[in-house]
């Protein structure tokens, strides 16, 4: 049974700045920043990025305080709750947007070019946050994404990162897309130093506890451990 995220929380796990930058690549159809950024992350400069929202106080300090380049996780938080270890936001095990993006990905893989239904599913997710249709994007090459299988696949990776950040799907996505492939790993390392210690064929799995291996002669330790 999953507990709901905490009211304010700890900072044992932080996001990386590239995620903020990716959210800010595109503006909405009315010229504002993607609202998912506001509801997903805390970071220095958020108040100026979203002047339409109140500059709330956290532990008595405004959330545009000088945090340097650090990025904190906000999704599911109650923002300013004084209570620890719980809140009344339910954790979504599977969201409709996740299903739409997975369906779009599957349709793309089953066809030579992205079918119209795949593009429709992608645009439904974008439309919910008032982003333009991918064909009309002012940042991405929408005409290529909507007609080229490989380009559509690569863009879906970005859309899933933005829509589903902090929802426990990223690792599954990376494994499905081939994190055990050197080219994919190099691309990840270029923006996220956390992957610098990732070793092909080893780090994709955790080691089996050695005590379990010692107690069971039929159990083989995972490769390279």
Please place each PLM-identified region on the residue numbering.
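Polar, glycine-rich mid-to-C-terminal structural blocks
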Residues: 1-26
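Acidic/polar-rich alpha-helix caps and helix-coil junctions
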Residues: 28-225
């Amino acid at each position: 049974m999953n507990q709901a995220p905490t009211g304010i929380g700890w900072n044992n796990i932080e996001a990386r700045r590239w995620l903020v930058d990716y959210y800010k690549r595109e503006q909405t159809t009315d010229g504002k920043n993607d609202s998912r950024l506001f509801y997903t992350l805390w970071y220095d400069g958020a108040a100026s990025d979203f002047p339409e929202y109140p500059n709330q106080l956290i532990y008595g300090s405004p959330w545009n305080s000088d945090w340097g380049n650090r990025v904190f996780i906000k999704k599911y938080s109650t923002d300013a709750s004084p209570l620890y270890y719980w809140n009344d936001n339910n954790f979504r095990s599977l969201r409709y947007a996740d299903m739409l993006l997975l369906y779009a990905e599957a349709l793309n893989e089953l066809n030579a070019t992205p079918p119209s239904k795949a593009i429709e599913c992608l645009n439904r997710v974008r439309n919910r946050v008032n982003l333009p249709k991918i064909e009309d994007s002012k940042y991405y090459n929408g005409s290529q994404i909507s007609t080229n299988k490989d380009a559509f696949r690569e863009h879906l990776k970005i859309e899933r990162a933005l829509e589903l950040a902090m929802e426990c799907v990223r690792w599954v996505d990376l494994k499905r897309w081939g994190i055990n492939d050197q080219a994919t790993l190099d691309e990840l390392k270029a923006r996220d130093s956390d992957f610098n210690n990732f070793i092909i064929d080893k780090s994709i799995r955790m080691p089996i506890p050695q005590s379990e291996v010692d107690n069971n002669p039929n159990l083989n330790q995972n490769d390279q451990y």
